[in-house]
Amino acid sequence: MIVGLIGKIIKKEPTQLNVNVNGVIYEVFVSLNCSSKIVSDDVKLEITHIIREDAQSLYGFLDSNEKKLFDTVIKINGVGPKVALAICSTFTPTSFAQIVSSNDVSMLKRVPGIGPKGASRILVELSGFIIDSNDETSGSSSALEAALALESLGFKKDLVSSVLKTCVNSNTSDLVKEALKKLQK
């Protein structure tokens, strides 16, 4: 599996790059957001390598949160790489997380290839989608552990994620205690 590429861009289109890595040229599909952030010919991309019976495709990302969004969305039944890339092109990971948390079907229907049923399915499947912030890596892992603990106690994902956003503690056990107090009200 190819998980990353470092090389020079020899051809750039809005959603596709040809990247020369030590004499081997790779075709990499990128979102419009990713493409607009590329200012130099030298590029370092995180890659999702998808192997199908009839093709192998590389999808590149400058941002690990965008890669996480893509990887999460393509796991949903009925959503392929093209629609996942369209989601990444239409929304930043942060704005997508806000759309999911607010259950905004109309915003999600703006993505080419997503209708009302598809938008509803995506929102149901991804309730509780959280992106990692670069400066709070340990805090986000504690929040994830706390969320899993609370869900195992029977609380719903969307309720848990909304309560955890209001919590101020940083370690897992304190987060769980604080969230339980808020959930009991």
Swiss-Prot record:
The gene is ruvA. Residues 63-134 are annotated as: Domain II. It is found in: Cytoplasm. Its main location: cytoplasm. Signal peptide: none annotated. The lineage of its organism: Bacteria, Pseudomonadati, Campylobacterota, Epsilonproteobacteria, Campylobacterales. It comes from Aliarcobacter butzleri (strain RM4018) (Arcobacter butzleri). Residues 134-137 are annotated as: Flexible linker. Keywords: Cytoplasm, DNA damage, DNA recombination, DNA repair, DNA-binding. Belongs to the RuvA family. Residues 1-62 are annotated as: Domain I. Has three domains with a flexible linker between the domains II and III and assumes an 'L' shape. Domain III is highly mobile and contacts RuvB. This is Holliday junction branch migration complex subunit RuvA.
